[in-house]
Curated annotation (Swiss-Prot):
SUPFAM superfamilies listed in its UniProt record: Plant inhibitors of proteinases and amylases (SSF57027)
Site (Reactive bond): R39, I40
Record-given protein name: Trypsin inhibitor 5
Pfam families referenced in this protein's UniProt entry, alphabetically: Squash
Keyword Transmembrane helix listed: no
Chaperone is among the record's keywords: no
Entry's Gene Ontology cellular component terms: extracellular region
SMART domains reported in the protein's UniProt record: PTI
Pro-piece positions: 22-34
Keywords: Disulfide bond, Knottin, Protease inhibitor, Secreted, Serine protease inhibitor, Signal
Lineage start: Eukaryota, Viridiplantae, Streptophyta, Embryophyta, Tracheophyta
Family: Belongs to the protease inhibitor I7 (squash-type serine protease inhibitor) family.
Length: 63
């Protein structure tokens, strides 16, 4: 199940993921480049510290 909202070139998708017993909502941000990056506040120093198609932003967090 997914819900989609679009504003200013960014598409947000809220999916239900399962951890084995509970379904948990997960927000993913899909930008203009087509990549998918979970919207989780995650500190980083390099792009390698980030998940999936995220990159390390100048504020020190993945996005």
């Amino acid at each position: 199940m997914a819900s989609v909202a679009e504003s200013s070139g960014v598409v947000e998708v809220i999916e239900l993921i399962s951890d084995g017993g509970n379904d948990l909502p997960r927000k993913i941000m899909s930008g203009r480049h087509g990549g998918i990056c979970p919207r989780i506040l995650m500190p980083c120093k390099t792009d390698d510290d980030c998940m999936l198609d995220c990159r390390c932003l100048s504020n020190g967090y993945c996005g």
